[in-house]
Amino acid sequence: MLRIRIVIACLLAAAPGPVAASGHGPVFGGAPPTLGRGTWQLDQAWMGRLGQGSNDDEQMLRTMLSVGITEDLQISGSLPITLNSGIYMTSGRTMAMMSSNQDVEAILGWRFQRRAVGAGARLESTVFVGGAVPLQEFRPDGMLAAPSFYASVATGYASRAHYFWVGGGYQYFGERQGDQMGDTVFFSAVYGYRPPFLRVDYPKPDLRFFVEAVGEHTARGIHHGFEYFLSGGDSVLIGPTALLLYKQYGLEAGMLFPVYQQKNLQPDEKFRFGVNFTYFFWRR
């Protein structure tokens, strides 16, 4: 925590003025907005999945720094601080832009399609590719950790009142000495609404409400060269989230609740949560 406070203090000191929060989206699902050229974004997230007992619960702090290279190209990097690591929970991806594993991760986003469809409304699509390197030798379930590759795409519509985004992605885990975590395929759908009395311009507070749905399929892992039966599974979750923007600050939070789970004898999730604080700034 001391390291995070020092980093945040240095970044705040380097920020000369406010910027628009064009790169911020939902808590869990994928979204196509990217940062403007020269805009930096610092995220401090607290995420978790709660199971049937303390051995099943997962909680993590994750710090992510992003920068807009052009209007349509951005790069992000993130580091974890694990608070609680579940032994038997199915591996997955809690947030579209942040891994829930003890990995250092980098992601490149390219918005390849952007089109105005009316006053203050647009259609846009973005592809994300990245990779992660583990900070641990073994995963919580005893499997050897290995680097992974990540790819996803998000597309949708955004206006001053309504937001609708859909996305999907894939995470591949490498093999190491006969151990390999199961690949994860995921999708998301997000609807957002901005009530009329909140449709104000910067720098006034901006509050948006979302309903997010996330689905995951994780293949069974390989342990010592054999299929690991206590791994893999499917889940679909849905829940409410909200985003508050004020000047160069952002705060979003929400929860997802399972509507379908098939866990291959692993504990079911009760719910998952995410809280994220954001600071936008220019680096001159």
Predicted regions, residues:
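Bacterial N-terminal signal peptides that target proteins for export
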Residues: 1-7
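N-terminal signal peptide c-region/cleavage motif recognized by signal peptidases
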Residues: 14-18
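Transmembrane beta-barrel domains of Gram-negative outer membranes and organellar outer membranes
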Residues: 21-160, 164-166, 170-173, 183-245, ...
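Active-site rim beta-loop-alpha module in soluble metabolic enzymes
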Residues: 180
